[in-house]
Structures are given as structure tokens and as C-alpha cells.
Amino acid sequence: PQGFDHWSILSGQHEQGDYYDPDFWENGKHIVEKGYATDIITDKAIEFLEGRDKNKPFCMMYHQKAPHRNWMPAPRHLGIFNNTTFPEPANLFDDYEGRGRAAREQDMSIEHTLTNDWDLKLLTREEMLKDTTNRLYSVYKRMPIEVQDKWDSVYAGRIAEYRKGDLKGKSLISWKYQQYMRDYLATVLAVDENIGRLLNYLEKIGELDNTIIVYTSDQGFFLGEHGWFDKRFMYEECQRMPLIIRYPKAIKAGSTSNAISMNVDFAPTFLDFAGIEIPSDIQGASLKPVLVNEGKTPADWRKAAYYHYYEYPAEHSVKRHYGIRTQDFKLIHFYNDIDEWEMLSLIHI
């Protein structure tokens, strides 16, 4: 990382890091921390805030690994949703009628792409020990023995249910969807708790209302819509992303906006609120005029957003595509090994 006074980033696992006893690169040094990543990252954030120069403003980027694949909950949350049945998306069994090849030829379906070992965790300890090259074992072995014991107990019922062999067709897809959601949302629980910890700390030191807090993500995510998990497509479920900004001194609580915003807007927004001149060559636009006006969209605000995904062939086999989205319509061009267009109406959304 460039330009930071202090940094601590996860390493390993395709540079995503591990959930249990994770490795970090911290200011150029490799360290291993004991515990659960979501908790540890928050500990580090609070430690940084405690040690900062109290006479200067601060900017801190607090990023979590969770809930990245393969959705491994904190030990305290293992199995917490095992008796919960989540509502299925209306298009969980999407047949992609009216869409082109891209939707049909992806490799990110709950039915076919979720793996029994890495994603669904359908391996016993004995089976992992027989094949220690298994990817699930590579993270399982990082757990303390008491966490392994709890893991085994929690997932034993899932493994037994699957191995009865009664699940076929749509029933199997529905079953996989439930396991996916149980692990995904159990993993998110620790994020919720730790954001609360951080906000409580800011309140404790008297800085909560003096700090601009931005809650966002790098993209949306498919949670069963179209029968998928993951992201990449320009469809609404993953093109739309959360963006919540709290700053009571200037932003009215509860105000919302339909203004089209993009991640390139973050930097000019931060500069604007900090009273720093925005460089003329910056691509985004400050969201401050929207935020301080109770979400009302300025007359000269952008009318469309551009999107481009080009990592094909790559994991999940999502075709290369670019497109434009307005408030009412979306036009997508899939290219490279295909040449197809999709136009979608958003008016009903």
C-alpha cells in the first residue's frame, strides 16, 4: 500500500487471507495472529485509533475479509442458523429464457459450481486427514482443536443429511441454497458485531459524531438470484452496492437518494468534506451536494453509469461485457467470444 502511515493487510488464500489464525503483512513485516479474522481486524482498528495523534484528523480504511467465499463463521456463530429456513428467491430456478449465452454458460451456479468440500463443507475430519491436499483441510488445520471439535459437531448433521442420497433435482438445489445462506449469514454476524464495536469505541472517545463513517462494499452479491452465488454480471443484484454515510453535522439521519453514484465518487467526496480542493482530472463527482441536501439529486448530476467486466476466461466463466445503466434502462453488450446484446427495463423495480 502506498501513502499510508500504517497498514496491516491479510495475506495468503489468493491474497484474501484466512478466517482462522490469519497471516498479515503489517508495515512490511509478516505476522500471524491467533483468533478469528473479523475480530482481529477490528482489534487492530481500535488499536490504531488509540495510538493515533489526537491533535490531528485521521482517515482509516477498515476492510473485512468476510463474507468472502468460503464463508467460514466465527466459532461462536457456528451452526447458529442450522434450524433456520431462509426464503428462496423467486428466480432460484431461473431458466434464463430471454437472455443470451452469457447467463447460460456461466460457472457460478448453486446447482453445479458450489463444491461439496470447499463450499458446502461435506467432509469429516477423518476424510480430510486422508487427503491433506484438500483445500478445506488447509483452513481446517488452522483452527484450534476446540474449534475443530465444534466444527465437526456442527457439520456432522449436514454431512449425514446429504449422504442419505434422498436429494435430487430442485430439492437438492434448495438444500444447497439453505446451506450456503446459513454459512454466509453466520459469517456476516461477526461483521455486524464488530462494526458495532467500532462505533461504540468512537462514541466512547467522543468522536462518533465528529467522524464521517462510510459503510459500503466493492459490489453486490448473488444470494441465490438466478440460481447463482458470486458477482461479476452487470445485473442489478451485484451492480447495486450498499452505501450508507453517517455524519450528523451535515447529513440528515434517514435521508435517502436515488442519485446514480459510483465508486469513483468516493475520493472527491472525502476531499470535499475535508475542505481539500478536488483535482480537475479526477473522474468521479463529490456526493456532498446530494448528501447535505437530504438526498435530492442536483439538476446537473449524471444520468447514467458505465460498467465493464473483462476477466474472461477466468474463474466463474462470466463473459466479458460492458454496458450503461440509467434510472429506467440497462443496455449490456457481451463480447469477445460472443456478440450479444441485452436491454433491460428497470422501471418496475
Where are these regions (language model features)?
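FAD-dinucleotide binding site
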Residues: 1-2, 38, 42, 46, ...
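C-terminal cap/loop subdomain of S1 sulfatases and analogous C-terminal strand-loop tails that border
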Residues: 3-14, 70, 219-225, 264-267, ...
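Active-site-proximal cap/lid insertion segments
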Residues: 11-35, 50-55, 61-210, 214-261, ...
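A short local loop/turn or secondary-structure capping micro-motif enriched for an aromatic residue
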Residues: 41-42, 232, 339-342
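Hydrophobic "lid"/C-terminal helical patch
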Residues: 45, 49, 270
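Conserved small/polar residues in nucleotide/adenosyl-binding loops
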Residues: 347-349
